[in-house]
């Protein structure tokens, strides 16, 4: 019998943006309920939903223009999913307290070949991506209370 404990490391369907239309609304809408964050390699588009308290969903996209090989796109998506999964409990708690929902789109914004470490092997690349993804998610967690206060007009 195996003691496989994958459950804590899942990225459940309830945390994912599934529909293409939801991505379109998230990326193309600009109003007081949306905001953007960028880091060296990644960007976030986020939209607040005051009518759906506590809802948190992530969408992850990596275009062929920035990562030509599917192996590389999968690596970047895995890195972003892991960063999102680790911050999800903190974000969900904050959203629950504030009584709003949030959709977050994460994407690679620079070509993979421009990232330092690409020529030093996959481990150096993973480290660069992981560090930047973690710092971006921490920046989101830090900025979110300010954004929520603006929505309420405080």
What are the residue ranges of the model-derived segments?
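Positively charged, solvent-exposed patches that mediate nucleic-acid binding
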Residues: 1-154
């Amino acid at each position: 019998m195996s003691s496989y404990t994958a459950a804590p490391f899942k990225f459940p369907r309830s945390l994912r943006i599934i529909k293409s239309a939801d991505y379109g609304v998230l990326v193309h809408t600009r109003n007081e309920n949306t905001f953007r964050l960028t880091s060296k390699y990644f960007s976030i588009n986020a939209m607040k939903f005051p009518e759906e308290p506590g809802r948190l969903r992530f969408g992850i996209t990596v275009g062929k223009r920035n990562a030509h090989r599917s192996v590389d796109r999968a690596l970047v998506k895995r890195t972003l999913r892991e960063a999102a999964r680790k911050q999800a409990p903190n974000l969900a708690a904050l959203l629950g307290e504030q009584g709003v929902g949030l959709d977050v789109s994460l994407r690679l914004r620079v070509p993979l070949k421009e990232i330092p470490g690409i020529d030093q092997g996959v481990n150096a690349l993973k480290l660069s991506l992981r560090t930047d993804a973690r710092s971006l998610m921490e920046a989101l967690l830090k900025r979110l209370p300010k954004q929520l206060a603006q929505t309420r007009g405080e």
